[in-house]
Amino acid sequence: MPERDPILLTPGPLTTSRMTRDAMLRDWGSWDAAFNRLTKSVCADLVRIAGGGDAYVCVPLQGSGTFAVEATLGTLVPRDARVLVPNNGAYCARIAAILRRLGVAHVELPFAEDEPASAHAIDAALARDARLTHVALVHLETSAGLLNPLDDIAAVCRARGKALIVDAMSSFGALPIALAASGIDALISASGKCLEGVPGMGFAIVRRSALEAAEGRSPSVALDLHDQYAYMQRTSQWRFTPPTHVLAALRAALDQFFDEGGQPARGARYARNCATLVDGMRALGFEPFLDARAQASVIVTFYAPADPAYAFPAFYAAVRDAGYVLYPGKLTTADTFRVGCIGALGADEMRGAVAAIGGALESLGIAMR
């Protein structure tokens, strides 16, 4: 008997629907008109979800979400710019690492791993250093599941006349975002997150005027968003071999996204998943790392058991044997693990995950205190 696919309680890759997986059973010619129409429809819908209107365009890119983050920073940020990076986790630090590699001056504004970035502190940092030209913000820091206040920070950037680039990798599709009148220059996400597609394609939704001003700026050929967009405008094609099956799966996932009711319905389902998970885990004795006011309903970080019998590899394996895949912790200040609430899942799967975790505690002899 074939093994049942595990349920992925991770922030991407994640459990996808049968319809999304079935969409990958067809082969596509990368220069074919039908595939070009598929690309165009996906890009139009991504701008629509972001509330961008005619002022924004979508540029898809082969690879993981980090490819799209690096491409966006390398394309939109001039080499003589100076970027403020609010930092409360590993994905904020990754932005700083990319800027360092690009040779772009940047200033990290540190926050604790359980502390949302403060719009007031960002405003003060911009006031102190007139050389700062951009802010690069992670909307949802997946290290802990921490939500940063995008609207408040965008308002500060508008008032200060600073360009804002947003990594919305783990929030786009689940949380409300409206680009029109936001002042955001670019929003970056990927196929395999809250849109419930499969991994393999990132994308940037960019203010048209900012992209058009970036010709020739990227130090990379493959990661040049301006060149990618200009080529697509001329030919309707990708510059290099596209992830055809990934795009087809994303088209199917977007159809299901709209059928479900779009972002409000998707976000509400994830919120129910999160509440079911947290309530069940608390009943087992686990406590979330974050205060509820800072917690996004996409992934929850829990403190690891204090019992010496606990070791994450064995705990992970026991839960995996029960059919659920957890995610290791990524914090520097506490021993934790993470449980995702996204994907083609509902409250029943969350209850099943809690039962599997409870079973792992019992089988491994781990006491909760």
UniProtKB/Swiss-Prot annotation:
N6-(pyridoxal phosphate)lysine found at: 193
E.C. no: 2.6.1.37
Catalytic activity: (2-aminoethyl)phosphonate + pyruvate = phosphonoacetaldehyde + L-alanine
Keyword Transferase recorded: yes
Domain of life (superkingdom): Bacteria
An MF annotation (GO) of this entry: 2-aminoethylphosphonate-pyruvate transaminase activity
Cofactor: pyridoxal 5'-phosphate
Gene3D superfamilies, sorted: Aspartate Aminotransferase, domain 1, Type I PLP-dependent aspartate aminotransferase-like (Major domain)
Enzyme class per UniProt: transferase
Pfam family, one: Aminotran_5
Entry-linked InterPro entries: Aminotrans_V_dom, NH2EtPonate_pyrv_transaminase, PyrdxlP-dep_Trfase, PyrdxlP-dep_Trfase_major, PyrdxlP-dep_Trfase_small, SP_NH2Trfase/AEP_transaminase
GO terms, biological process: organic phosphonate catabolic process
Keywords per UniProt: Aminotransferase, Pyridoxal phosphate, Pyruvate, Transferase
Family the entry assigns: Belongs to the class-V pyridoxal-phosphate-dependent aminotransferase family. PhnW subfamily.
Subunit structure: Homodimer.
Functional summary from the UniProt entry: Involved in phosphonate degradation.
Protein name, per record: 2-aminoethylphosphonate--pyruvate transaminase
Organism of provenance: Burkholderia pseudomallei (strain 668)
Lineage: Bacteria, Pseudomonadati, Pseudomonadota, Betaproteobacteria, Burkholderiales
